[in-house]
Amino acid sequence: MPKYLLLKHYSGGPEPHHPFPPLDQWAPEDVEAHFAFLRNVGEVLRESGEYVDSQALTPAQTWVRYGGPDAAPVTTDGPLPETTDLVAGWYMVDVDSRERALEIAAYISSEPGPGGGPLHEWIDVREIMSHAPVAD
């Protein structure tokens, strides 16, 4: 069965979605409802045997790249003002088909936001490579 990484994007995606304030500005009951929904998604996926893992991510980030053979790694802390995207978390699922991964992603996108309405967050659906690509 193929595995997929479902990346939850707080902002970004192919087109703008409904703007919401950052999570730390939500009412406590909205935060609890949001995370209760996400915990329930994990429980449902465990029961179906499709759950591999999931994590929420903090907004703080550090970018790093190779600095060269005799140089330290180059790092930049963020989030950066010019960065328009923030990955808020992810689920990894092991499913029968891409269609099932899309179905799960669409459901996750309905997670409640401020006031209880759906966030309509973009979910980036990426298949996990099962083997290295072969050059022609």
For each feature predicted by the language model, list its residue ranges.
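Conserved, structured core segments of small domains
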Residues: 1-136
